[in-house]
């Protein structure tokens, strides 16, 4: 969908009018683009829970939309700098636009200045016993959806006989 009028209102910072324009889409079919626009309007109007609902809906539609992770980071920045930083990290992971990457990186660096910031790598442990194909899918999914610098992967084999390791 185009959402041309809604985009124009957002660019003009006409938030109340954008909220009214958004009303015509609220009961229709959603996509991640509409979720980004709606979350932007809700957050500009100070309705952070409404923004969160739109972001969650958009991520269900497309979990690779970096703009939704950026908005989610903005939502969490008021509550938990670690969650915000992780959202910005996901935004960077999925973003290919260099200008947007710089902006996201600035958000990430700003959050890191918070004294409460403390994010460590995650250890993902996979216990295996045969089921080579399932294990490969699991590992592939982790590699497709997680920044390689954010985790370590530990595979523990329980004497597989199908060539799993």
Describe the residue ranges of each PLM region:
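Residue-level recognition of tetratricopeptide repeat
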Residues: 7, 40, 74-77
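Structural motif corresponding to the intra-repeat A-B loop/turn of tetratricopeptide repeats
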Residues: 12, 45, 78-79
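Canonical positions in the second alpha-helix
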Residues: 24-25, 57-58, 90-91
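Short coil turns that delineate tetratricopeptide repeat
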Residues: 29-30, 63, 96
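N-proximal low-complexity "stem/linker" segments adjacent to membrane-targeting elements
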Residues: 85-144
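A conserved acidic beta->alpha catalytic loop
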Residues: 157-165
């Amino acid at each position: 969908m185009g959402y041309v009028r809604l985009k124009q209102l957002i660019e003009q910072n006409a938030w109340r009018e954008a909220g009214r324009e958004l009303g015509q889409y609220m009961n229709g079919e959603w996509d991640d683009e509409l979720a980004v626009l709606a979350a932007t309007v809700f957050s500009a109007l100070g309705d952070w829970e409404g923004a969160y609902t739109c972001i969650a809906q958009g991520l269900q539609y497309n979990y690779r939309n970096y703009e939704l992770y950026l908005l989610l980071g903005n939502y969490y920045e008021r509550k938990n700098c670690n969650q915000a930083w992780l959202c910005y990290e996901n935004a960077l992971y999925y973003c290919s636009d260099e200008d947007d990457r710089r902006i996201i990186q600035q958000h990430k660096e700003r959050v890191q200045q918070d004294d409460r910031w403390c994010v460590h790598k995650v250890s993902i442990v996979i216990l295996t016993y045969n089921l080579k194909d399932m294990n490969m899918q699991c590992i592939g999914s982790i590699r497709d959806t997680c920044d390689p610098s954010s985790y370590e992967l530990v595979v523990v084999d329980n004497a597989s006989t199908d060539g799993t390791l």
